[in-house]
């Protein structure tokens, strides 16, 4: 058998984790999506006439193919990109359930390929998922016989709704270039991969830089605040003195920026990302 994990049935009904392939007029072969390779996915796409064997519902259509309307209006979106270097088909379902449990603000998830999964998060109220995933990664890999790398995407507010598909694809393209070169398990922030990508040729798609810069410009005094924090190695008291404002006022702006974007200006990786974005404004 080519697909020993498959099963035959007399109707095309398949759950969200399966794909149904017509064998005859009254017989379909059901396969688990997680067991399919990229080549098999393309073959099934040709056989079924679908764009992809990994048809993950409305969010998949909206983000991957830029089709339809945003399935659910939320004030801020974040994408968690997961790539599995090693996995066992028998444990994928349990791993997905665990991920849905530890990401309480998840509103959807879908499969991009046999090794790639996306979780869509509602970050209207900020949930620090990076810390949760870093704390649990080793246990997850051990419990479910997996080796995976995770990228925490940037938080994008609803004002960029028309660009969500392009932003998602730009994020994922950067993540793919990362794991193709650095194949080890870890949890990485958007800032880490963005700064890594700056040093590579054509790794950062312009829309990422453009939209982040727009966010910075939308916040009062933020360019000056980022520059002052950079010059004072993120020491808030010194930066406030340089800006001639009260320390609490500066802290308010820092907290407001984190609430909007998840970026922490007192954390040097996030601060470096923001400083790179404002360099053209201050040079």
Label every model-predicted segment:
Residues 1-72, 221-283:
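Alpha-helical/coil-rich non-catalytic "connector" segments in signaling and regulatory proteins
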Residues 26-133:
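Long, mid-chain structured domain cores
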């Amino acid at each position: 058998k080519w697909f020993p994990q498959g099963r035959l049935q007399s109707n095309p009904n398949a759950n969200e984790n399966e794909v149904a392939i017509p064998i005859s007029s009254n017989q379909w072969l059901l396969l688990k999506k997680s067991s399919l390779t990229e080549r098999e996915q393309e073959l099934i796409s040709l056989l079924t006439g679908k764009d992809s064997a990994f048809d993950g519902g409305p969010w998949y259509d909206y983000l991957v193919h830029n089709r339809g309307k945003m399935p659910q209006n939320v004030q801020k979106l974040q994408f968690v990109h997961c790539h599995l270097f090693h996995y066992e088909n028998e444990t994928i379902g349990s791993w997905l359930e665990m991920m849905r449990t530890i990401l309480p603000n998840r509103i959807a998830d879908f499969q991009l390929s046999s090794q790639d999964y996306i979780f869509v998060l509602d970050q209207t109220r900020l949930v620090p998922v990076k810390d949760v995933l870093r704390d649990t990664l080793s246990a997850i890999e051990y419990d479910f016989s997996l080796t995976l790398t995770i990228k925490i995407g940037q938080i994008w507010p609803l004002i960029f709704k028309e660009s969500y598909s392009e932003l998602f694809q730009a994020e994922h393209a950067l993540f793919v270039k990362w794991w193709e070169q650095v194949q080890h398990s870890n949890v990485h922030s958007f800032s880490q991969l963005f700064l890594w990508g700056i040093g590579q040729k054509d790794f950062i798609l312009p829309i990422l830089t453009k939209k982040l810069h727009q966010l910075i410009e939308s916040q009062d005094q933020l360019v000056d605040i980022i520059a002052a924090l950079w010059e004072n190695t993120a020491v808030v008291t010194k930066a406030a003195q340089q800006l001639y404002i009260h320390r609490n006022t500066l802290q308010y702006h820092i907290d407001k920026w984190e609430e909007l974007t998840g970026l922490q200006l007192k954390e040097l990786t996030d601060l470096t990302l923001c400083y790179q974005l404002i360099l053209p404004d201050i040079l």
